[in-house]
């Protein structure tokens, strides 16, 4: 397999901007790349696919597959799960619902038959991924993003129907030191009367990776704004966690300083922590949902626990909107100039190259 094309552009930092600003850039890049240059991923044929596309998309950075779990077939009241299973190449990662300091969460858009209703992604516990002075939340290795599907009592595929067709458009940002927006179109046919359980082990593991809810917020499950930090108290965690160091993942972005170590300790069965607020904070919630999990090395799966923290005390004023640093602005302008005299070769199926991303960033610079 041929190696990556050499990059003639000035190197750009790994998403070194607040996620609010990055979101604007990345979404714009995504649509420019997908519509103008035709570099979206092509679906490869999986088991019993239906046009247009198959159940698997492969890029140089990930393999993404639309999978299903319907142990009793597809019918009213029967359990039905769909999911996108992403297998990352080594050192590459995609993002959680709150991507952290930079990045974008994976997005799923479903096209389902009448009577089937897809819920939200049941996000597994993420891992903290350090990139220089930043901290992101996401996944490496293989992860399944499961989605519960409700089958209505009115579901009526017809007396001669044997299968239902599920279609999915997914978009994800995959990063190493560089970030590449990718998308895929997936199609899968599910038998109505027969069992679909080929990926039952993966769905069982994904179920165990879901954060378990703690008791409703109380005086022992709260957060207190204290100057430029948040004092957190959480009771009701399993006894097996007592005395151990925990990771806290806020579900809401741009509230806490993701890369700051903070301080934490146990007071009997109550876990307490002091976590600095984000320098570019843009949210001031009265309730902050968080996920807690034991701190481990690498991407080892571990159970997580979800709490809705009642936030007390006045929030400081939110930070002014961030601007692009002079160094990044200079690099973007230089890359835009180079892009005018260099046309990249066709990218591999499914991937937009960093050189293309740099050129588009330069073109967008005037709109920041």
Please tell me what each predicted stretch does.
Residues 2-5:
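Acidic, Ala/Val/Gly-enriched low-complexity intrinsically disordered segments
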Residues 32, 71, 135, 356, ...:
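N-terminal hydrophobic or amphipathic segments with adjacent small-residue motifs
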Residues 346-368:
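Core alpha-helical transmembrane segments of integral membrane proteins
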Residues 9-29:
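Bacterial N-terminal signal peptides that target proteins for export
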Residues 26-38:
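Bacterial N-terminal signal peptides
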Residues 41-352:
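Extracellular/lumen-exposed scaffold segments
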């Amino acid at each position: 397999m041929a190696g990556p094309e050499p990059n003639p552009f000035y190197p750009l930092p790994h998403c070194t901007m607040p996620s609010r600003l990055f979101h604007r850039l990345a979404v714009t890049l995504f649509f420019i790349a997908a519509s103008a240059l035709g570099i979206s991923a092509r679906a490869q044929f999986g088991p019993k696919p239906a046009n247009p596309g198959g159940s698997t998309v492969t890029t140089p950075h990930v393999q993404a597959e639309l999978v299903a779990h319907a142990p009793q077939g597809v019918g009213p009241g029967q359990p039905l799960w769909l999911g996108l299973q992403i297998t990352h190449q080594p050192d590459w990662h995609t993002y959680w619902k709150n991507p952290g300091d930079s990045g974008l969460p994976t997005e799923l858009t479903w096209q389902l038959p009448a009577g089937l209703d897809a819920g939200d992604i049941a996000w597994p516990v993420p891992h903290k991924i350090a990139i220089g002075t930043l901290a992101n939340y996401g996944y490496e290795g293989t992860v399944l993003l499961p989605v519960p599907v409700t089958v209505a009592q009115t579901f009526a595929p017809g007396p001669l129907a044997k299968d239902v067709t599920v279609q999915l458009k997914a978009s994800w940002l995959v990063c190493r030191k560089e970030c590449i927006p990718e998308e895929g179109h997936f199609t899968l046919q599910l038998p109505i009367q027969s069992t679909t359980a080929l990926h039952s082990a993966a769905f069982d593991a994904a179920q165990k990776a879901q954060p378990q809810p703690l008791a409703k917020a109380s005086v022992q499950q709260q957060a207190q704004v204290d100057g430029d930090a948040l004092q957190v108290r959480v009771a009701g965690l399993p006894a097996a966690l007592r005395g151990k160091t925990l990771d806290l993942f806020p579900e809401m972005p741009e509230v806490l300083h993701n890369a700051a170590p903070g301080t934490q300790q146990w007071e009997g069965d109550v876990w307490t922590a002091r976590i600095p607020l984000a320098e570019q904070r843009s949210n001031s919630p009265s309730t902050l949902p968080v996920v807690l999990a034991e701190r481990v090395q690498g991407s080892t799966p571990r159970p997580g626990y979800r709490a809705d923290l009642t936030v007390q005390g006045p929030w400081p004023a939110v930070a002014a909107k961030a601007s692009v640093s002079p160094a990044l602005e200079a690099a973007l302008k230089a890359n835009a100039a180079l892009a005018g005299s260099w046309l990249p070769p066709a990218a591999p199926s499914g991937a937009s190259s960093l050189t293309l991303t740099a050129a588009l960033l330069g073109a967008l610079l005037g709109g920041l």
